[in-house]
């Protein structure tokens, strides 16, 4: 996603490029320190039981404004790739959404414990990255 954005002239700051844990607060603070215009956090969802749920969901502080528009655009693109669109939902209690000084979106790209989502994720990875990047580009 980042390289696609950079190819389109967007300056990208990564809070994490290795598999070393950083707390949500640390990530939010890094975004604030670099003065980012937007904060996008990309994750895989999980459920209590395997194959219980399927789809993409984006989380925002509230459903109004720039973050919500970006979340809707990202979800629409991921739906075109083949994910079930579970919608844009408010989660004002999440640190990366309530501690950033800029519009923030947390994207849950399918369920990591759902076979269908994993198959889609693996087989269409580049299209997924493009859909997320396009959703961001449409919103900035």
Could you tell me what each predicted segment is?
Residues 1-140:
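Active-site-proximal helix/loop segments of hydrolytic enzymes
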